[in-house]
């Protein structure tokens, strides 16, 4: 069976020391593709670097709603200019996040 992990955060500090081993372990259990999801535009270069380094790894570009206040004003054009890169396969994180009940609906 082939598995696609459509939502991982390979750029998080938790994985930095063992990233290659983590990706190898995932491949050994059938994960053939991974999409590492952007939470901040400021971290996007790191995501793109990871996606470019590893076959089968792609990335998204976006700003998680909980990070939006810390990231400053983000224009759609700031995001769209990267979408033509072959390793960028989506836009996200985006939207409203009520999972942790910390997002202001207004």
Predicted regions: what is each one?
Residues 1-106:
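Mid-domain alpha/beta scaffold segments of enzyme catalytic cores
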